[in-house]
Amino acid sequence: WTIGHVHSGALGWVGMVSFGAIYFLAPRMWARERLYSLRLVSVHFWLATVGIVLYAAAMWVSGIMQGLMWRAYDALGFLEYSFAETVEAMHPFYVIRALGGVLYVLGGLVMAWNVYKTARGDLRDERPYETSSAAPAAAPAE
């Protein structure tokens, strides 16, 4: 539980704020009009978001499970689960954590590529995101 909590704050909150600051500062540091690619910013955001959700959620669930296993006693007052059984039960969650970490790091690599191309002065020919052709929102409530 604690590991999931700390990593959701450190990677989720601090990491995302840091990424936003880098994206804001990169074009200004190298006197560029804009970032190389806003689409890559979106790719990075979704890779990092899905990665941190998998990472933190897996650690939250496995931490609670570990705590429940450590406080389970048999009729004689001995621990019901050995340490090895606890570690074995947590293994699938470590696999999910690793997958989340890989996605988060891949997002960071996408950001590094985008910042590198921005520093070089390259511009990507991108069409802007299309806006929805849906009807406008109803009038605000009074």
Language model segments and positions:
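Hydrophobic cores of alpha-helical transmembrane segments in multi-pass integral membrane proteins
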Residues: 2-33, 37-86, 92-123
